[in-house]
């Protein structure tokens, strides 16, 4: 399990701490396998939190509804994605993850949870 203070890059190894997290890891591995074996493209989105900001942790993990819509639309509209894993997080000052990889989709998050601090 990653420490809560760790900055987690997109290429960090899977470290699930719940069965839900384990299922998400399986889905990513399944997408990778289908890309390798069948050339089926997919974009796996690691959405950290999309609910209203109610605690300090969410100041880093929040994904606004507008940014979520933009991310999904960009993933659908991008002509070639291969197999991709991206973090779904708004442009938060305290983001604990690197969401730069989503830029190839044209994703440019505009919201920031700092407004709730």
Ranges and model annotations:
Residues 6, 43, 61, 95:
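Residues that recognize and position ribonucleotide moieties
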Residues 84-86, 91-108:
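Conserved C-terminal active-site "lid" loop/helix of NAD(P)H-dependent oxidoreductases
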Residues 36-39, 46-52, 62-83, 91:
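Alpha-helical substrate-binding/gating segment
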Residues 1-38:
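Catalytic helix-loop patch of NAD(P)-dependent Rossmann-fold dehydrogenases
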Residues 17-21, 53-63:
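Glycine-rich "substrate-gating" loop/helix at the edge of Rossmann-like oxidoreductase active sites
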């Amino acid at each position: 399990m990653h420490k809560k203070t760790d900055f987690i890059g997109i290429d960090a190894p899977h470290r699930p701490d719940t069965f839900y997290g384990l299922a998400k890891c399986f889905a990513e591995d399944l997408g990778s396998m289908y890309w390798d074996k069948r050339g089926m493209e997919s974009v796996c989105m690691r959405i950290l939190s999309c609910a209203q900001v109610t605690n300090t942790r969410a100041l880093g993990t929040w994904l606004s509804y507008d940014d979520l819509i933009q991310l999904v639309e960009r993933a659908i509209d991008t002509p070639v994605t291969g197999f991709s894993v991206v973090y779904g997080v708004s442009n938060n000052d305290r983001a604990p993850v690197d969401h730069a990889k989503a830029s190839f989709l044209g994703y440019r998050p505009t919201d920031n949870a700092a407004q709730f601090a």
